Amino acid sequence: MDAASLALMAKDMTPTPVEIPGATGGRFLIQLLNEDADRGVVTSIIHLPAGGHIPAHLHRAGSEMHYVLDGDLIDAGREFGPGGFLTHAAGTTHGPHESRGGARVLTVQHWQSRDGKFDFHLTGKAAAPPPGGTAAAGLPPDPTAPNLGTGDAEAPTG
């Protein structure tokens, strides 16, 4: 297999702790399947603990997709079980995410981190799009620009 390809078995990867700004209710874990955007979309499995809560947030650099592998995921009050699918355009406030009994969620993003910084920005209420455009239109073009006071996420810890 060449350097532009990747093949692995997720079940063989040990989940590692990940710090998610504002998250409460237990220890969140991640299996980072592909972080190299040159090889394709950034792909991970997020393990939400029973009672886990991730506050409303957005991603500036690209869209994000969630597919519930097992357990329960609650997104802004709407419940999803295995097979549940959600997707959000860049700059779209989504969440809060919660799980009553725990969940494993396949997450696919166009871009996730650079220099150890995740593209994760806490928000308050769902932001309305600026006049004449989408929510992403009013965002800074550089996803690595500091977002002071909003709790940019840290890299996975292990």
Regions found by a protein language model. Give the residues of each.
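A short, N-terminal "cap"/entry segment at the start of jelly-roll beta-barrel domains
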Residues: 1-40, 122-158
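Conserved short histidine dyad/triad with adjacent acidic residue
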Residues: 26-59, 79, 89-93
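Solvent-exposed residues in well-ordered beta-strands and their adjoining turns
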Residues: 49-51, 74, 110
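Glycine- and acidic-residue-biased ligand/ion/polar-headgroup-sensing regions
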Residues: 59-75
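Ligand-binding loop in jelly-roll beta-barrel domains
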Residues: 62, 79-82, 90-117
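An anionic, turn-rich surface loop/hairpin at beta-sheet edges
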Residues: 85
